[in-house]
Amino acid sequence: MRAEDILAPTPAGVCCKRGGFYIDPTRPVEKALITHGHSDHARAGHGAVLATQETLDIMRLRYGDNFAGTTQAIRYGEELKLGGVTVSFHPAGHVLGSAQIKVACEGVTIVASGDYKDVRDPTCAPFETIQCDVFITEATFGLPVFRHHDAKGEIDKLLRSVALFPERAHLVGAYSLGKAQRVIAMLRGAGHDRTVYLHGAMEKITRYYESRGIDLGELELVRGAKKSELAGHITICPPTAMGDLWSRRFPDPVFAFASGWMRVRARARQRGVTLPLVISDHADWDGLTSTIAATGASEVWVTHGQEDALVHWCVSQGLKARPLDIVGYGDEEESEFVASDESLSIPSPLVGEGQGGGVS
């Protein structure tokens, strides 16, 4: 059996006709298997959705209770028969609940990675290498120039700046799902026990992470805090908020941005970032190539990102490779713009909730 007889790229995403499903479809379909909760992979409007419990919960937080006709949760490692194929979900190390999807049929095994990283993250299960015949990999940072710095060193750089400028506020642009919580957890791991402030747009998902047992220490909402109270503290906010009037209410703010794209100095300058933090939730070039080799796959399909460069590398290693050229996937580190939605869905309020005045 050929891999193309099991999975095939279509305008709506990777389709498994034998199983009657799509993986991370880019438009509404009858049955969708979703790798993780970022909006370019997890869309509302499908007839049925199969995903990890965390991904389903995150979709519900973002889209409301009726984001799909029906939903089904699957545990890591659990096998499920769908039509003529067997599927299972395995940790991808990208964000909480993120998964690779393994599809097996008549002796052929295909693994769709979704977005992934191969470095430790205290807020989600680590990436699991799965042996397969065909590996479908992302390529967000699929160029040799992208070699991410050690994330711990970037956190140390942030803390040195806070110590050097105690009279200033530090605003860290980070995306609401995954990056924000990872940065906070790494700050705690580095011994930073001071209150971390949150923009209101970060609250729902950060609360959800805490409800799943992830300890993020003392957090307060920015609204209700006096300007003087924010000096010497770190505030986590959507990247777009750093250019808003909102940011002018902080005392002489230092603008930081946690993203793999901060490896490109021009992007940092364009965003007015004075403290770029190269912290990514995607594998860098070395992570992509080492992961491909570790899977033992003889064939690699490359999607969303720098497809051609990674295909070329695979061919140079004697592997069969092709780009999938599916339109509709982006990169949350570059294009996700979080609205300032301060509506609440989970109990156990953060310190500072409901206080009047101050910054929101």
Task: Enumerate the language-model features and the residues they cover.
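C-terminal regulatory/interaction regions
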Residues: R2, G213, L221-I346, S360
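His/Asp/Glu-rich metal-coordinating catalytic cores
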Residues: R2-R27, K31, G37-G178, G189
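Short, polar loop motifs at secondary-structure junctions
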Residues: P9, P25, I34-D40, E54-I58, ...
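Conserved beta-strand scaffold positions in the cores of enzyme catalytic domains, especially
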Residues: Y22, A32, V49, T71-A73, ...
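Short, well-ordered alpha-helical microsegments
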Residues: A42, S98, R120-D121, A180-I184, ...
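Short coil/turn segments at beta-strand junctions that form active-site/ligand-binding loops
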Residues: G47, V108, P166-A169, H192-R194, ...
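Binuclear metal-ion centers of metallo-dependent hydrolases, dominated by the metallo-beta-lactamase
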Residues: E128-T129, L143-K227, E299-L344
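Glycine-biased, low-complexity coil/linker segments
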Residues: G352-G354
